[in-house]
Design a protein with these regions (language model features):
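Sec/Tat signal peptide C-region and signal peptidase I cleavage site
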Residues: 19-23
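Short catalytic helix/loop segments, enriched in acidic residues and glycine
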Residues: 49-69
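A glycine-rich helix N-cap at a beta->alpha junction
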Residues: 100-120
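Active-site rim beta-loop-alpha module in soluble metabolic enzymes
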Residues: 170-178, 182-228
Length: 288
């Protein structure tokens, strides 16, 4: 009888020890969402995304709507944490009270080279772009530019990059893939050309300098579903990288003061090289 009791106790003890080992804890999945404004549904004029514009409040609300749709899609896909980076202008467009309370919001201008990607690190599993736009000079694009209206072209190692391109490179430094982007059709085509077949929603397209697009509600519905799909299939996404050293060529309409280490190639064109991508981006931010 004693022997049977000891055996039973041993089995109970084994079960207690084994239970935590067999119970699978959910893996942490952090999602980084960078949100710009020019690529939001309905936006067609720079006045609409300027703080002193009469319709800014309206499009600020649309920005929050598309942001929250992406946040919801991320959590539906299993995200355990979401960081939203306000990435437009002075980075003070999203009002904290308007953002899904499950997400953390990073707002305000950054002095660091990551800029629109401030906060990204290797603990994240996926990056999402909302409200993004094509690079300067892109035909058939809406409000196309590269960071400022002064930039004509920006290349790294010979690759001409939109904001989404160099932001994807920044994420790539930490091994994090961009899995989804929303913006106009030209933006979607441009990023897929650089990053491969990422999830995307083209919320509008250019027709004779006008914008033909989805209603905000439909855009938000498609973003929510698209982000969820993209994050669920993130294992297929490609981390975007270029091989160091990094050589940038920046063409501008009006020259700024030369950054330390930069060289003037000709009027309106400068170059800078470094094995450190963040150093290159710092030079770009100083001279753009």
């Amino acid at each position: 009888m004693l022997r049977h009791s000891i055996s039973a106790l041993a089995l109970v003890a084994l079960a207690i020890v084994a239970a935590p080992m067999s119970a699978q804890q959910p893996r942490a999945l952090k999602v980084f969402i960078s949100v710009d404004m020019e690529g939001l549904a309905g936006v067609v004029s720079g006045v609409e995304v300027s703080a002193n514009g009469p319709d800014y409040g309206h499009f600020r609300a649309i920005m929050a709507g598309e942001t929250n749709a992406a946040v919801e899609g991320a959590f539906r896909a299993g995200a355990t944490e979401v960081l939203v980076r306000d990435s437009h202008g002075d980075k003070r467009n999203l009002l904290p009270a308007d953002v899904d309370p499950r997400a953390r919001l990073l707002r305000g201008a950054s002095s660091g080279p990551k800029n629109m990607m401030e906060g990204i690190d290797s603990t994240f599993g996926a990056v999402v772009f909302i409200g993004y736009h094509a690079k300067a000079g892109t035909p058939g694009a809406i409000l196309e530019h590269t960071s400022t209206g002064n930039v004509v072209d920006f290349t790294i190692n010979g690759v001409s990059l939109p904001e989404g391109g160099y932001n994807a490179l920044t994420a790539g430094l930490y091994g994090v893939p961009v899995v989804f982007a929303a913006g106009d059709r030209a933006l979607v085509e441009q990023l897929r050309g650089l990053l491969g077949p990422i999830g995307a929603v083209a919320v509008k397209e250019e027709i004779g300098d006008a914008s033909l697009g989805m209603s905000p509600k439909r855009a938000q519905d498609e973003i929510r579903a698209g982000v969820e799909r993209a994050i669920r299939s993130r294992a297929k996404a490609r981390v975007y990288k270029l091989s160091p050293p990094y050589t940038m060529v920046l063409k501008v309409k009006q020259e700024r003061a030369l950054y330390a280490g930069a060289l003037k190639v000709r009027d309106g064109e400068v170059t800078f090289a470094s094995p450190d991508l963040l150093a290159v981006l710092a030079a770009f931010n100083a001279m753009k």
